[in-house]
Structure formats: structure tokens, C-alpha cells
């Protein structure tokens, strides 16, 4: 589904991605873990085309979308995204946020409004919130709205950027379970970046660890606890001492 080959990204003289190789199977939920500044968000932005890598190849659904420093347009691939913090539009009502894609593509107001209600119901929110603004909702409810927006286009792939950041443990667990359920319902492939190991263990089929711009470990969530990789051991146990500094 998603294949990344020898991907490099620099910012001035700093190498952020250093030859990343990654293959994500269709219909799976993959999670990339790693500390702050390890290149997780940069990798997602490169896949989305928000940043241009210096070198490497990116393919999605057997379609080559990036090679030789250039992106190739492909309108056949539908992508959903839940940004860190939700990234809702403060000036738009909740239904307008959820139906933003449909509104931008000229769908009529009645369709957009009703479709927003349907997608909000899928994440456990009722029609009482549709005319509110994001600032009138709690952080957990805003994340649900963002998830409703991400699934509204029935995407082939959904990217999640730190989906539980800023949430209390109960709200985080709700979001994790909604991610599992909704990704399965629409048959999407998902890729999540997080430093929250509880979330990673809950939603993943496979886990990758990114450190200093390189994938240094990969495996399923059942094997990560038994790995002897010192970087992984330090990270998943939150240890101050170890090779990560």
C-alpha cells in the first residue's frame, strides 16, 4: 500500500530523514514511534507532499507519487488526516469543519449538513454540536470532530499525527478505540505517529521506531516488549539512561 525507499530530507545542513525504508501493507494499522525531533512528522509531511524530500521514492497503491525530487499528481488516492491538536477551523461551525471537503467541492448545503451529522454520529457526537464552534467543545470532543472529518471522504489511507496528545487517559482511550473501529469500518490503511506507547500498543498491527531519521526497529506489538534493541527498550520504558540522549 505505502512503500518508501531511501528517503532523505534535509533542513539546511541538518539531515532529518536519513534513508528511510518502509513498507506498509494494505488494510493494516501501522505506528511509528520515536522521541521529539526524530523525524516522525517530517516523514508524514513528505508522504503527504507538504515537504519535498531531497532523494528517494514514495509509492501508494502501486502508484509512484514521488521520484527524482518531484511529486506526481494522482487523483485516485483518497487520504484522510487527523492533525495533532485537531486543526479545526475556529471560524467555521462544527458541521462546516466536518464537511469541509464536500463544501470545497461544491456540494449543496443540505447534503453537507446531513453528511456531517452522519459522520459525527459515527464518532459518538449528536446533532446538538453541529452549529457550535470548536472553541465551545472540549479537547476530546474536538479530536472526535477531527476524526469525523478524516473519515468523511471514506479515504484509502488515514494519517494520525499524535492523536492522543493533550487528552486525559480516559479521553485518549476513547479516541484510540474510535480509531480502531472507524478505520476498520471504512477498510482504510492507517499510519500513526506517536510517542504515546499506550496508544501505540492499542491501535497498532505493526510498530516501527524512528531514531535520528532512520528506522531502527520494526515488529508487531507483541514482540516489542521482548526486544533487546537498547533504543527501543529505553524508549518504551521511559528510561533516562541509555543510548538515546
Task: Go through the PLM ranges and name each one.
Residues 65-80, 104, 224-227:
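ABC ATPase NBD coupling module
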